[in-house]
Amino acid sequence: MKASMFLALAGLVLLFVVGYASESEEKEFPIELLSKIFAVDVFKGEGRGCKGFGDSCTPGKNECCPNHACSNKHKWCKVYLGK
């Protein structure tokens, strides 16, 4: 009787420890994912020889990256959606 109670208690403790460890990993995963997503700035054209989203430009000079166009009104590169 004492052995079965000890085994049941040890099983519950083990279950608690495993559950806590997996929960802490689950909590860290979204944080790691978000940090990796926001560490990469895909909107900037640095190192590509073209200007990315939000960079200042001169209309008519074709300085913006592909799929971007220089706004005549605001004078910065924006995503070109076409018409």
Curated annotation (Swiss-Prot):
Cystine residue pairs: C50-C65, C57-C70, C64-C77
Prosegment location in residue numbers: 22-48
Q: Does the keyword Secreted apply?
A: yes
The source's domain of life comes to Eukaryota
Family membership noted in the UniProt record: Belongs to the neurotoxin 10 (Hwtx-1) family. 15 (Hntx-3) subfamily.
Q: Does the keyword Disulfide bond apply?
A: yes
Leucine amide, modified sites: L81
Care to name a GO molecular-function term for this sequence?
A: toxin activity
The residues the entry assigns to the signal sequence are 1-21
> Could you give the subunit structure recorded for this chain?
Monomer.
Q: State its role.
A: Lethal neurotoxin. Selectively blocks tetrodotoxin-sensitive voltage-gated sodium channels (Nav). Does not affect tetrodotoxin-resistant voltage-gated sodium channels or calcium channels.
Any one GO CC term of this protein is: extracellular region
Principal location? secreted
Please give the tissue specificity annotation from the record for this chain.
Answer: Expressed by the venom gland.
Q: Which organism is it from?
A: Cyriopagopus hainanus (Chinese bird spider)
Could you identify this protein by its name? Mu-theraphotoxin-Hhn2j 4
Domain remarks in the entry? The presence of a 'disulfide through disulfide knot' structurally defines this protein as a knottin.
Return any one Pfam family short name.
Toxin_12
Q: Keywords for this entry?
A: Amidation, Disulfide bond, Ion channel impairing toxin, Knottin, Neurotoxin, Presynaptic neurotoxin, Secreted, Signal, Toxin, Voltage-gated sodium channel impairing toxin
